[in-house]
Regions:
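Non-catalytic helical/linker scaffolds that mediate oligomerization, partner binding
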Residues: 1-473
């Protein structure tokens, strides 16, 4: 079998200027990428249509389903354009941030792309340049402007992000741009939609209602990057309401403190596994490869740790969007994943109450049976993907070959742990036929080959009720 078949933790790569061609997209997928992230903070829809076509074309050429994720910008607040693109500041400086300013004159009256006066209160912290400059709100100057006091020396740059760790957005995390992007995205049939700066489960419920109204079946990924989202009780409700979680470690470190990120990451992965939710670990996983052809030892350890904790997906951002070595980065990440999964067991997690149901017990039984009889694979027949997802939640140490009649289901399963989706016509013996086909292609290696077949006769999603052990000849 090839490395790509064995890779149980999946790779999600961000497309950008460094990978803006059909050839580069093909190379990313060939190197081991299972899903493409489209960052809606940048770019135009005309470019995105081209990118989507590249992904779908390369997917067909390689014969592997690939997920596409629409990552909404959310209330990402940025400075406007500064004169000379930079401004030096020092402790004690008083800055005015005004959404009405369009042209910066070099003074401490700064343009900002959001009306902070509507949301912020006196004495709340405001972090500028992605956390490099710390300030505190001292005055609400007008209906469009606030005055902040600088807490450390440094400099600001045009269009850099602002973070408001203690500010309550009052449920307004979907901007008008996000709503417009959602409407356009529904016409493109994305597999996943990621929502930024989630603060509570109601944010997800609102997004799901909007997607339903638009006729979209995209799964919702909640990005955890705020202090309020990591409150233990709140976090669990967010996990339960979503289809998956992205541990957005960059903004989370700025908003809540870098020291909490490793523990929060571990907690989120455990919760997602407990509730059968997709979990993506993101941000600077191989950041040094933006400029260097090899990862650092710390980055390799970071990826390996996510694999050991049982993450479904590890994500690349700048590395593949803007880096000098996008394809090499994917190869390095894949190599790390494969070595780690072959030499270290995935950590165990608490089982959720929902797993006391019959279909969940059967999924657990299938995973344990496959392990004990040393099966080469679990073959999961699934219409909606639920059967394969239930099995994957137990993190079996072998491929889950998923056979489905639905292309959309196959694309979503492309990001699920250990899943290898195939699209086949709906037949009662589709799983058996696929197993025989793969055996003839040499997918399972040398004889004897034993597989575990898992399926359900009940038309309801996830109603697994059939397990078979089959020796392929």
């Amino acid at each position: 079998m090839s490395d790509n078949i064995f890779k149980r933790t999946k790779i999600l790569a961000t497309i950008g200027p460094a990978t803006f061609s059909q050839e580069k997209v093909y190379q990313l997928l060939e190197a081991g990428v299972n899903g493409i992230r489209m960052n809606f903070s940048h770019g135009a829809n005309e470019e995105r249509i081209e990118q989507i076509n590249w992904v779908r074309t390369a997917s067909k050429q390689l014969g592997k389903p690939v997920a596409i994720l629409q990552d909404l910008q959310g209330p990402k607040i940025r400075l406007g354009v500064l004169k000379d693109n930079m401004l030096n500041v020092k402790v004690g400086d008083m800055l005015v941030l005004d959404s009405e300013i369009t042209d910066h004159d070099g003074s401490f009256n700064l343009p900002v792309q959001y009306n902070l006066a509507e949301k912020m209160k006196v004495d709340e912290p405001l972090y500028m340049f992605d956390g490099k400059i710390r300030t505190v709100v001292r005055e609400i100057v007008s209906s469009t402007a606030i005055r902040v006091e600088v807490q450390n020396d440094g400099f600001l740059m045009s269009r850099k992000g602002l973070n408001l760790p203690d500010t309550d957005f009052g449920g307004d995390i979907l901007t008008q741009k996000d709503i417009n992007d959602l409407e356009w995205g529904a016409s493109q049939d994305f597999d996943y939609v990621a929502l930024s700066f989630i603060q509570k489960a109601d944010d997800i419920i609102d997004l799901r209602r909007r997607l339903t109204d638009l006729g979209s079946t995209a799964n919702i990924i909640a990005k955890i990057e705020t202090k309020s989202a990591v409150d233990p009780e709140n976090l669990e409700e967010i996990v339960k309401a979503s289809d998956g979680i992205m541990v957005a470690r960059g903004d989370l470190a700025v908003e809540a403190g870098a020291e909490i990120v490793p523990v929060v990451q571990r907690r989120i992965i455990a919760l997602c596994r407990k509730y059968c939710k997709l979990v993506i670990v993101a941000t600077q996983m191989m950041g040094s490869m933006v400029d260097n052809p090899e990862p650092s030892r710390a980055e390799v350890s970071d990826v390996a740790n996510a694999v050991i904790q049982g993450a479904d997906v590890v994500m690349l951002s700048d590395e593949t969007a803007n880096g000098k070595y996008p394809v090499e980065t994917v190869r390095a990440m894949r190599k790390t994943i494969i070595y780690t999964q072959e030499h270290s067991e995935v950590m165990l997690v608490e089982k959720a109450e929902m797993r006391e149901k019959t279909d969940a017990i059967l999924s657990y039984t299938a995973a344990q049976l496959a392990r004990r009889i040393k099966a080469r694979a679990i073959i999961a027949g699934t219409r909606t993907g639920a059967t394969a997802i239930n099995v994957a939640a137990y993190r079996p140490n072998l491929p889950i070959v998923c056979v489905t009649e639905d292309v959309k289901t196959a694309q979503k399963l492309a990001l699920r742990y250990a899943s290898r989706p195939y699209v086949r016509p709906s037949e009662s013996n589709a799983a058996t036929k696929l197993a025989d086909e793969l055996k003839q292609e040499g997918y399972f290696g040398a004889d004897p080959v034993t597989v575990v077949l898992v399926s359900g006769h009940n038309p309801e999603p996830g109603k697994t009720d059939n397990i078979q052990v089959k020796t392929l000849s």
